[in-house]
Amino acid sequence: MRHLITTKDFNKVEIMELFKEASDFLDEKPRTFLEGKSITTIFFENSTRTLSSFESAARRLGARVLRLDVSRSSSSKGETLYDTAANLDAMSPNAIVVRHANSGVPLILAKHMHCPVVNGGDGKHAHPTQALLDLFTIYNHFQGNVEGKKICIVGDIKNSRVAASNIELLSRFNLDITLVAPPHFMPNTHLKKHYKLDENIIANSDIIMSLRTQTERHNKTVYASLKDYANDFCIQKSLVKDKKLILLHPGPVNRNIDISDEMMSNERTLVLKQVKNGVAIRMAVLKKLILENEG
């Protein structure tokens, strides 16, 4: 039984196959690959983009979607994770997409399920489909020529599952990664590090990936105000100037904190393209896992 818990669960050949499939799905036409199949989504953390994206992907493949309301589920009444897994499995879904505030929950569920489990984000640990769609966006923009491209990841890197998954995946595809964050947002890493964003860093980047400040994962106040943070790390036109690059963000964007209003409307900012690509990538992932499991 295969699952997608981290980006390491797919090798490079499989990822390129996913990209080829996802490219076909960008036409947004409905398919019947998963007709008669049932996909359950259970998100223990709030989500708009990821949940909607997975559900759109499932429906475009012809699958039925069962969204479990966590606020009314038995887990909110004290049911153990193992009992939750057993009950989910008894419903015989063809796949489960799960998000949880605690790292490791999707892996625990996967050990007790008889269907593929897809990690929709767990704590600070991983968000594999986000990293896949980010690389897919980069891959398409540079027409497959991604090796050696310089990417600057800016923001709350230490607390970001998006950063963790991207660092693993982009390293495997030989992108040149630089991290920019204040000291308390910087993980222990061998990668190049800077503690303030400046023009020279941007001038030497092909891609900038801005990240949201994960205030819900902070144990204490680390900035007097987000405006103080923005002074050093907001992506602004005055910094980017006319540099030929692309700007990514996993969403939701804190405007004028992560990225300025002016840059959000700039043609180099591909946030909405990431959203479109995300549905296609998740279609490819669901199709692969479900059909391989039944094959």
UniProtKB/Swiss-Prot annotation:
It catalyses: carbamoyl phosphate + L-aspartate = N-carbamoyl-L-aspartate + phosphate + H(+). The keyword Phosphoprotein does not apply. Pathway: Pyrimidine metabolism; UMP biosynthesis via de novo pathway; (S)-dihydroorotate from bicarbonate: step 2/3. Its EC number is 2.1.3.2. SUPFAM superfamilies: Aspartate/ornithine carbamoyltransferase. Belongs to the aspartate/ornithine carbamoyltransferase superfamily. ATCase family. This is Aspartate carbamoyltransferase catalytic subunit. It comes from Campylobacter jejuni subsp. jejuni serotype O:2 (strain ATCC 700819 / NCTC 11168). The gene is pyrB.
